[in-house]
Amino acid sequence: MIRTDAKDGALVLFSGGQDSATCVAWALERYQTVETLGFDYGQRHRVELECREGVREALKRDFPAWSDRLGDDHMIDLSVLGAISDTAMTRTIEIETAANGLPNTFVPGRNLMFMTIAAAIAYRRGLRVLVGGMCETDFSGYPDCRDDTMKALQVALNLGMDTRVVLETPLMWLDKAQTWQLAEQLGGEALVELIRVETHTCYVGERAELHDWGFGCGECPACKLRKRGYEAYLKGERVTEAPL
């Protein structure tokens, strides 16, 4: 059910992936105006950006209650991030775990830059809420996905911009099975199918084969996580509902 008491508009970080697409739907269920924001930073899996418009069009077409709420889309060239990053997300190198215990898919500063730019755009657009798909339940250990990081960043943004912006991370405490379940709660099987077919997660950008859980190579950490979560979701292994 759409909340009619929503007063604040939201800006959603939308990459074209499963998590961020679920966050767009989550925001559409809550706010009268929802805009989306993507970043081109030279990511190896740039195909995800090409999925964004298809997802937006499907949300407008297949979910009439959300259609009028989905507003403008913004795309930011952040190639400087790719230029200063030497990671498996921005270079064609083998995905592996670095000496510090983090996978070499970690892009230092990425979410910090994303949220800072998003806050500046939201300030200009009169939007008070920023929504991101960060999660520290099923995740790769990225420090900029942690709840503490997001809370600290919210404080810094409000101090630095003399405003009152709220950072919402609806997936923070959900595993991937619960994220699929949340999509079903928000938009039924139609939204689950949209996310399965239209979004992209694979780190290497493979989009040649459609698996039960979506497109991807099936071998990279992102594909394995998405596959495992989808299979658990289908089996109903999470008996508690994902919190709306």
From Swiss-Prot:
It catalyses: 7-carboxy-7-deazaguanine + NH4(+) + ATP = 7-cyano-7-deazaguanine + ADP + phosphate + H2O + H(+). The lineage of its organism: Bacteria, Pseudomonadati, Pseudomonadota, Betaproteobacteria, Burkholderiales. ATP binds at F14, S15, G16, G17, Q18, D19, S20, A21, T22, C23, V24. It comes from Burkholderia lata (strain ATCC 17760 / DSM 23089 / LMG 22485 / NCIMB 9086 / R18194 / 383). Its cofactor is Zn(2+). Zn(2+) binds at C202, C217, C220, C223. It is an enzyme of class 6 (ligase). Keywords: ATP-binding, Ligase, Metal-binding, Nucleotide-binding, Queuosine biosynthesis, Zinc. Its EC number is 6.3.4.20. It comes from the Bacteria. Signal peptide: none annotated. GO terms for biological process: queuosine biosynthetic process. It holds the Pfam family QueC. GO terms for molecular function: ATP binding; ligase activity, forming carbon-nitrogen bonds; zinc ion binding. Pathway: Purine metabolism; 7-cyano-7-deazaguanine biosynthesis. SUPFAM superfamilies: Adenine nucleotide alpha hydrolases-like. Catalyzes the ATP-dependent conversion of 7-carboxy-7-deazaguanine (CDG) to 7-cyano-7-deazaguanine (preQ(0)). This is 7-cyano-7-deazaguanine synthase. The keyword Zinc applies. Binds 1 zinc ion per subunit. The keyword Zinc applies. Belongs to the QueC family.
